[in-house]
Amino acid sequence: MFLGQYFEIFDWFIIYFTENNGMAFGLELGGELGKLILTLTRIFIVVFAIRYLFKLNLSKYKRPVLVCFGLILGGAIGNIVDCLLYGVLFNDSYNNIASLFPEEGGYSSMFFGKVVDMFYFPFFSTEIPSWVPYFGGNNFTFFKPVFNFADSCISVGAISLILFFRRDLNSVSYTHLRAHETSNH
């Protein structure tokens, strides 16, 4: 597919090929330094989270909680892999279809690749009434962001942890903290 090309599965489900240089909703830190900082920060957070999970006694967590952690970490690692490798392995998608292992090399170096997003769910569109300050008269589409499977994993895992397992996390974390404090004295 060409960058920006799309096809409809249903009116409310579109496969839309785009590349995201930043993070959620296309937010960027700006420039090459910003991209490098973003990629290194993602790697640091994932490594820290994995190390923290290994320090915990995971047997105290229910299996669904561990699945949520797995979704979050798996999604984060998937997006990191895109940032690290996509630009090295593929050529530019502007005005042509990206090819794997192009003779001239990829469009960027390690750490500077873009994340591929493709899922678009414009469930409904409406015009905001003109009397609404600032936004009045503008078109509003719900749900406008284009995202990928890794983003979905992160979102589902995080929302599930917050909605369904908040008490479990608080009690196990508190128990872990108390055990750690006791062992240090």
Language-model features, listed with the residues they occupy:
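Alpha-helical transmembrane bundles and membrane-interface segments of multipass inner-membrane proteins
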Residues: M1-R178
